[in-house]
Amino acid sequence: MIATLEATYSFAKKFPHYKDFYIKHNDLVFSKLGLGTFNKEPYKEENYVFHYIEGVKEAIKSGINLIDTASNYRYGQSEKEIGIALEELFQENSVKREELIICSKGGFIQLEFPFPKNPYTWIEENIINTSLAKLEDIELDQHCMTPDYLEWSCKQSLKNLGVKTLDIYFLHNPEIQIGKLGYKIFLKKIESIFKKFE
């Protein structure tokens, strides 16, 4: 199930008092204001306490249908909170999945909360030993763009969000890899990612 023109248009019609708040683009009706879930200072323990759930629900009930997150935000906690909020809204019949435009991103390595004692061991066990990537595919100890890693990362996002599909999946700061790969190899890498996801 993905966002549809009919459903996103129907969602926008629930808020007739919002003049010029919605825009049609690529056969979907988006709220001009979206909900993002990035949080700075990732190593502070209080950043991992669930506190977005009610905010996500209130944003959607107030007319926002564009939700943006990433697999690495708060080590997956942001996606998990959105997933809880969506499940509650779906059960209340407050919104349908097709009315929402859900976006996530892949590229940065999504360590899991609680933060592993040794992130390098986590990367070795979960990414390298599972053949999602080789050590040399990982830039700055935190960014990976192999097609297999990104497919795995996307599946983790779907699981965290509790949905079967994403409407938009972004490559998260792919330019990080240009210095290491060079421009021509970088473009070939992007092409291989698109082929994997088509």
Q: Which stretches of residues belong to each language-model region?
A:
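Glycine/proline-rich, positively charged
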Residues: 126-198
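N-terminal binding-site loop/beta-alpha segment at the start of enzyme catalytic domains
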Residues: 1-121, 164
